[in-house]
């Protein structure tokens, strides 16, 4: 594939708002999980909640979109000067030539939960001020971002469970390569809600401790929330126009193995297909990857399947899951971890797997227990969702991409 430029990016999660606080937490191996105190949930588990979401209503002209999920999206869009960079892209290309691709799993379902608590006791009708289309509808986050920037290009919501925030890069790439747009705002946003917490509890997948990916004592996930975005554009025709360390999207792999509604293929066949496709599309070999950001949810079956998918290809490649720090942010996870990959490339370090203290010897992985500075030229980021919806992304720096082109 032709590389795409990540001209700007940002991330907001329980470990920090924006890149600086996120980077500090990753370098210091500092997690943001706390005992669950969300809404009226009575669950013995840990969550990754973003501070300040409920204190910032959505912009007045977008009041119809008012809900926690869109508040979180807005909080993410206003970090790191991201909104200004998008505005500059709109001025350069035109509002009809900038697309929007947002991944989400549950969107603003919390607003529906609250609406049902306010039903008319006589007839059961939902309150008149409940706006399903602008809140709970899975398209809501994409529509909100499109309206936030007054864009007129194509807008899509991607909802493929936990790979949603990664698959947005593939959708944007296809639109750009087809010549339909010149740039895209891609990202993922999912906020906490009772449906998610109790749903994963019913599957017996919630851990009673902060989750411990790839650890011998791992026993389940911790749910988090996040908003992460990137501005994706074509690489300029003149190489001199790029900074030597600019971040590029080099490869994308997607697969759908449909093994089971909530369990991965035990041998990780669909995941491996996505990884191999990403390597092929980037014209790279496994030996070119310097760090793997694992999907790493900390359930026994998920981590084992991902380990088998990586197999001998990456047995000696440093890897870690940042979900021990952020929790599993579901539809936002792929986008959030893409930004982690970009930070690893920009800052030349690999982040530690927070909460993991004793890597499972049964899993073939060179698991990073302490963040360290090292040469990082290309990063593989994995996102594997329920139902076998898999996506792997490869990011690199321009210097490495130039070397790849010369081979």
Describe these PLM feature segments:
Residues 3-7, 27-38, 42-46, 210-282, ...:
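Condensing-enzyme catalytic core mediating Claisen C-C bond formation in acyl metabolism
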Residues 11, 60-81, 129-137, 155-167, ...:
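Active-site pocket-shaping loop/turn-to-helix segments
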Residues 104-156, 302-313:
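Active-site-proximal gating segment of KS-fold condensing enzymes and close homologs
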Residues 123-129, 170, 191-241, 259-261, ...:
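Glycine-/small-residue-rich "gating" segment that lines the acyl/pantetheine channel
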Residues 138-142, 146-149, 154-187, 223-243, ...:
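Active-site-proximal alpha-helical scaffold in enzymes
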């Amino acid at each position: 594939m032709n590389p795409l430029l990540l001209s700007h990016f940002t991330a907001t999660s329980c470990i920090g708002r924006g890149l600086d606080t996120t980077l500090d937490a990753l370098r210091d191996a500092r997690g943001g999980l706390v005992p669950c105190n969300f809404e009226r949930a009575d669950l013995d588990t840990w969550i990754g909640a973003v501070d300040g979401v409920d204190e910032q209503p959505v912009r007045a002209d977008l009041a119809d979109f008012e809900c926690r999920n869109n508040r979180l999206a807005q909080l993410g869009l206003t970090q790191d000067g991201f909104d200004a960079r998008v505005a500059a892209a709109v001025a350069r290309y035109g509002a009809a030539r900038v697309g929007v691709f947002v991944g989400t799993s549950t969107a603003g379902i919390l607003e529906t939960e609250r609406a049902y608590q306010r039903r008319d006791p006589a007839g059961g009708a939902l309150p008149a001020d409940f706006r399903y289309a602008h809140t709970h509808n899975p398209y809501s986050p994409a529509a909100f971002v499109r309206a936030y920037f007054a864009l007129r290009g194509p807008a899509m919501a991607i909802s493929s469970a936990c790979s949603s925030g990664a698959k947005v890069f593939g959708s944007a790439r296809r639109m750009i390569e087809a010549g339909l747009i010149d740039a895209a705002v891609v990202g993922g946003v999912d906020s906490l809600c009772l449906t998610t917490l109790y749903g994963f509890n019913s599957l017996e997948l919630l851990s009673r401790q902060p989750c411990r990916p790839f650890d011998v004592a791992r026993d389940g996930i911790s749910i988090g929330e996040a908003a992460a975005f990137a501005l994706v554009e074509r690489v300029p025709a003149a190489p001199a126009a790029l900074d030597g360390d600019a971040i590029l999207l080099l490869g994308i792999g997607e697969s759908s193995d449909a093994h089971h509604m909530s369990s991965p293929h035990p041998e990780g066949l669909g995941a491996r297909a996505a990884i191999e496709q990403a390597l092929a599309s980037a014209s790279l070999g496994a030996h070119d990857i310097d760090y793997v950001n694992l999907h790493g949810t900390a359930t026994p079956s998920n981590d084992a399947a991902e380990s088998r998918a990586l197999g001998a290809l990456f047995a000696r490649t440093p890897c870690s899951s940042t979900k021990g720090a952020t929790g599993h942010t579901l539809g936002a996870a792929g986008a959030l971890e893409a930004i982690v990959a970009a930070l690893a490339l920009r800052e030349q370090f690999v982040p530690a797997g927070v909460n993991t203290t004793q890597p499972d010897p049964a899993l073939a992985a060179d698991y990073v227990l302490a963040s360290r500075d090292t040469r990082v030229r290309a990063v593989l980021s994995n996102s594997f969702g329920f139902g076998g919806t898999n996506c792997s992304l490869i990011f690199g720096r321009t210097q490495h991409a130039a070397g790849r082109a010369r081979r």
